[in-house]
Amino acid sequence: MTTPDTLMLPARPEPIALPVDKTAVIVIDMQNAYASPGGYLDLAGFDISGAAAVIDKIKGVLDVARGAGMPVIYFQNGWDSDYVEAGGPGSPNWHKSNALKTMRARPELQGKLLARGGWDYDLVDALKPEPGDIQLHKTRYSGFFNSQLDSVLRSRGIRHLVFVGIATNVCVESTLRDGFFLEYFGTVLEDATHQAGPDFVQKAALYNIETFFGWVSTTADFKGAVGQREGAG
């Protein structure tokens, strides 16, 4: 039952109770790199055609979350302009990052992809943070790795994380998994996420999450649960 203090969110594999004062919305990497034509994913050959719809879904989620008093935490993924944080050949990231590989294959892009301070790194215009929102940076797929996220959450008593953003199968899943290991309850809103790769990787990521690491819900159910809370108040 939804009350003024708790949302009962319909989800898979079962509904989950979200205490409003212990829940934050985590916005993963809604940057030009991942959601805009001419950004890194687009230049690397990934299909970003679903990103526009995801942006609209996220806007609706953030509006109701802010209205309910939930913290909104934005992540941006990338590195310093000299790519020191990306790691050199001794780092697996140097070998596996598609952004770094794309720049090595196309030298004219060197310094343009995921470089802090550049257009590619910037959040998309439609999802700029509002006063009171929190912005964090990360240099690897997981938002918990070498970032302030854990301390930001613990200092606010946050135990429940609602995830939106790109890419479902990479940074969203990586951050939710790491949160699971740190005793956070993670829920992803499936229609407010988009994958990097074929459709089947979206399905696989959501299967992994709902079966092993967390819960899967929708933007409509999230907004509906918030609305029921307001009615209960």
From Swiss-Prot:
The keyword Hydrolase applies. Its EC number is 3.5.1.110. Keywords: Hydrolase. GO terms for biological process: nitrogen utilization; uracil catabolic process. Hydrolyzes ureidoacrylate to form aminoacrylate and carbamate. The carbamate hydrolyzes spontaneously, thereby releasing one of the nitrogen atoms of the pyrimidine ring as ammonia and one of its carbon atoms as CO2. It catalyses: (Z)-3-ureidoacrylate + H2O + H(+) = (Z)-3-aminoacrylate + NH4(+) + CO2; (Z)-3-ureidoacrylate + H2O = (Z)-3-aminoacrylate + carbamate + H(+); (Z)-2-methylureidoacrylate + H2O + H(+) = (Z)-2-methylaminoacrylate + NH4(+) + CO2. It comes from the Bacteria. Signal peptide: none annotated. Belongs to the isochorismatase family. RutB subfamily. One of its GO terms (molecular function) is hydrolase activity, acting on carbon-nitrogen (but not peptide) bonds, in linear amides. This is Ureidoacrylate amidohydrolase RutB. It comes from Caulobacter sp. (strain K31). The active site is at 29 (proton acceptor), 138, 171 (nucleophile).
